[in-house]
Amino acid sequence: MKKNAVILAAGKSSNFAPFTYEKPKGIFCVKGEILIERQIKQLLEAGVEEIHVVVGYMKEKFFYLEEKYGVHLIVNNTFAEKGNLYSLYVAREYLANTYICCADHYFVDNPFIEENPLNYSYRACTFYQGKFREFGVAYSDAMVITDVSVGGMDQMAMVGHAYFNESFSAKFRNYMEQEIDRFRVADMFWEEFYAKHLKELSLYVKEFDNRSILEFEGIEDLRQFDSEFLLNVDSDIISNICSVLKCNPNEINE
């Protein structure tokens, strides 16, 4: 079965300022690899050759990917005013048997090399201990999501990627086309929009270890994973700070 992927890369990631003044978060070098390039290579390794990347903020920084990896870029010029649902909307014609990814996630192991003989649609999830701000989920004995909450405690939560099969994609696309111009719908995360139609859209929980999918929330979070990040960030801002303070990058703290 042929599968494709849509990588969402339009956002600004303002919690990584000032570094995102120079380049988008998806272009950060982490442990010697560009985040989005690592993800593209993992998709290609799994046989997913049709890859669409939705760009917006500093879109020109991603142009080289077309020639280097043969990906298809889709421009979302309204990234600053709208949620990532709108990025899926501008890529809606490509939704089929599709992985939905974010450019700035780091998959320790390749999650796209998998067994899914029934081709079910799923959302990657992990168990969080304590309070969290991600989308929490409740699910049935059959592992079908039955409720979505914003934040939670000591429960399963959405993390990383999702997979839509062709039937799910057709329904999701239809709902987007019907509702995208309604008040505040375009401002939503796609997960919020899915939650509105949860009874009509069956999405399974696929559990991952909480150390296998990383979503860096800030610079210090990233540095805990890659202690050499500031040495490899290729930032004029860091260079200027080091010049003024006469220090090396790893001596800089928040």
Region spans (language model):
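Residues at the starts of beta-strands that form the adenosine-phosphate
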Residues: N4, E49-I51, N97, S202
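Conserved core of the sugar-phosphate nucleotidyltransferase
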Residues: V108-R184
